[in-house]
Amino acid sequence: MIENLNNRLIKYKDLIPSKKPFVESKLEGHKDRSVYSIIGPGVTEELKGISLNEPHGFNLGGVDTAPNNGSSLHSHTTAEVFMIHKGPWKFFWGADGEDGEVVLNKGDIVSFPTNMFRGFRNVGSERSIMYTILGRDDPGVITWSPEVLKKAKNTGMVLLEDNSIVDTTQEKIPENKSVLAPLNDEEVKTFDIYRPEDIEKCIIRYQDLQSNNDTNTGLNFISYIENFQIDNKTLAPMISHNQLGFTFGAVFGNQSSLKNFYSLDTHEIYIPLEGKWKIYCEDQEIIINPMDTFSVPVKLKRRFESLDDKGFMYIVREKID
């Protein structure tokens, strides 16, 4: 019996926010934000509100903030790819945040390498939102720059060695647990340095995709990360990051459809950026809207159709190395 497709549809309006997901959450510029665990727990230090807690080979999260709010400098041990749904966002990187910066807007993609410090901030005049793909079922933990942990401690927030957070203004640190010490200078030097031109190779701008395909009709496919196979085509990636645990592509077109059904033995999700999309899964169908997430049942035959002009939809697939 085929599962009811609505059980695998995660609507943006139903996402459950975590208001204090990280140790920095009481610092100025980090208070007015919501973090979402859409698929899997992600790397939040306050585990709550997972929309779909089923291993997919990757995690999907989201963050929305008020203007001038964002995230402090941090590093990951697995991939972190940002999909901008509403901007603008400024990204900055380096141990002190001064190695480079870039402003990205709706539809832009950036894939940050591991073992580097990066942060971001909403530099618009309204609330902005973006989704993040984190590699693997267990994406590891966040490593914060030393200054973040020191400043957070002054607000009463401490990060423990087991990656849990304690607000010492409201509770005591458990006797059997220890506070995580900030990185020392030698440890900071082990993180990689990237120039602006290096990170530019990790960015795909939405405007460039649109201008290159204005005259095309029907469905168009692109691959951001890893070779992407669809509609009897194999698409080469535009970003040369690999072994991340997932492949990442997109489909766009004006009121067009993928005619042939296909199936996969691994997980696949759809996330519209623009327009409504109808998803056909064997004898069922469902409509998904921008910022919704639909996880297709494994092995089920599926195809999709763009219902609006200028439809654009992300596709993320589990990749077993």
Task: Describe every region a protein language model picked out.
Residues 95-113, 282-299:
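Short acidic-glycine-tyrosine-enriched beta hairpin
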Residues 77-90, 94-95, 264-278, 282:
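Glycine- and acidic-residue-biased ligand/ion/polar-headgroup-sensing regions
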